[in-house]
Design a protein with these regions (language model features):
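Perimembrane loop-to-helix junctions flanking transmembrane segments
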Residues: 47-61
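Extended, low-polarity transmembrane helix blocks
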Residues: 1-45, 60-71, 75, 82-209
Length: 209
């Protein structure tokens, strides 16, 4: 009885199974488009940063890689928004996230913002000495600003924090893109779905030989 009710419930809910995929796309699209736009707007600086070994990533073929990263994020973000070729565009975006994780963020641990109370920094799960030292540095910075700066104005847009720049965002985006890679843009809510539906309808109308 319960098993049948459970099956019937989720059978009815399956008509809306495209909504989570739509929400993933709507979440990711502006992030990717903005990242691609920023790269395109300062492309020469991005190329320098990709190739420079002193202050950048020291990657080979920086012009090619910068172009590919920019195109993947800018074009891929637009395609995600539309639900067009969702599985295909997820691939270069996942590669871009992996490159960012392993060339920029991995040495900083997991957290994007230094939070010494996090289990991902205090040794409960992971240990990050830099994050654990952040509260003392933040306290010193606040003290200086309270003494010599307009502290109320400086914090009127939000509290001061220490940026850790770990892999948190990159890994999260990668997982979201991985879901889209396996499940596509979503039923009823993507161009992919309607294009495939039209193709199936067309094939179904062809005479059998």
């Amino acid at each position: 009885m319960i098993k049948q009710l459970y099956a019937n419930l989720f059978k009815k809910l399956s008509v809306a199974d495209g909504i989570p995929l739509l929400l993933l796309r709507l979440y990711l699209a502006p992030v990717m488009i903005q990242a691609g736009w920023n790269k395109a707007s300062s492309f020469s600086s991005i190329v320098d940063w990709f190739g420079n070994e002193d202050y950048g990533l020291g990657l080979p073929f920086p012009l090619v890689l910068a172009f590919l990263a920019t195109a993947a994020e800018l074009v891929g973000g637009i395609f995600l928004l539309l639900g067009l070729l969702t599985r295909l565009v997820a691939i270069p975006l996942m590669v871009t996230m992996l490159v960012a994780i392993f060339t920029v963020h991995i040495d900083n641990g997991w957290l994007a913002i230094a939070d010494a109370s996090s289990w991902l920094a205090d040794g409960t799960i992971l240990m990050n000495d830099s994050v654990m030292a952040a509260p003392e540095k933040l306290s010193a910075a606040k003290s200086l600003l309270q003494t010599y700066g307009n502290y109320d104005w400086l914090t009127s847009s939000g509290s001061l924090v220490v940026l850790n720049n770990g892999i948190e965002f990159g890994a999260t985006y990668f997982v979201m893109l991985l879901v889209l890679f396996f499940y596509g843009g979503g039923r009823y809510v993507s161009i992919d779905y309607f294009a495939l539906s039209c193709e199936i309808t067309t094939l179904g109308s062809l005479p059998l030989k």
